[in-house]
Amino acid sequence: MAQISDSLDVAPESFSTETPNEEAPKAPRAVLNVSGGAVGRRKQATARVRLVPGSGSITVNGREFADYFPNKLHQQLVNDPFKVLDLLGSYDVVARISGGGPSGQAGALRLGIARALNEIDEENNRAVLKKNGFLSRDARVKERKKAGLKKARKAPQFSKR
């Protein structure tokens, strides 16, 4: 029976438990001259979004992005689909948003941007956007007020006697 040490002619220089990453060749990215549009909704807000190849400027209801969403958290939320696809600064966004508050509007804009990016290049973008949850509509909305209650669930004080 052969010894293990006999089978090695030269000792290896370094040992590694990792296997080399052999990623499947990706389909070439679509040329960034294709525009797309979509609608996103969140809570009571609706965003109609248009993506046009450009410098990365975002215009919401005719106002600059930073003016419309001064909260950095909302700005980050809206830019997330571009970040995960490495397309930050590749498209100009023109959006019309109606209804809801700042948080709902930011969520609606994010969904609209993600759907538009999906429409532009479904082969390359869909899997990444879906994995990060950007193509899912958040169905949570305000619960309706019920008769006999003060709010959706808040009841008037109850007295046993």
Swiss-Prot record:
Q: Which InterPro entries match?
A: Ribosomal_Su5_D2-typ_SF, Ribosomal_uS9, Ribosomal_uS9_bac/plastid, Ribosomal_uS9_CS, Ribsml_uS5_D2-typ_fold_subgr
GO biological process: one example: translation
- Which spans of this chain does the record mark as coiled coil? none
Q: List the disulfide bonds.
A: none
Keyword Ribosomal protein, does the record have it? Answer: yes
- Region: Disordered; residue ranges are 1-28, 142-161
Q: Which Gene3D superfamilies match?
A: 3.30.230.10
Q: Which UniProt keyword terms apply here?
A: Ribonucleoprotein, Ribosomal protein
Report whether Transcription regulation shows up as a keyword of the record.
no
What GO CC annotations are associated with the protein?
Answer: cytoplasm; small ribosomal subunit
* Gene Ontology molecular-function annotations: RNA binding; structural constituent of ribosome
Family annotation (PANTHER family): RIBOSOMAL PROTEIN S9 (PTHR21569), SMALL RIBOSOMAL SUBUNIT PROTEIN US9M (PTHR21569:SF1)
Q: Which HAMAP family match?
A: Ribosomal_uS9_B
Family classification? Belongs to the universal ribosomal protein uS9 family.
Q: What protein name does the entry list? A: Small ribosomal subunit protein uS9
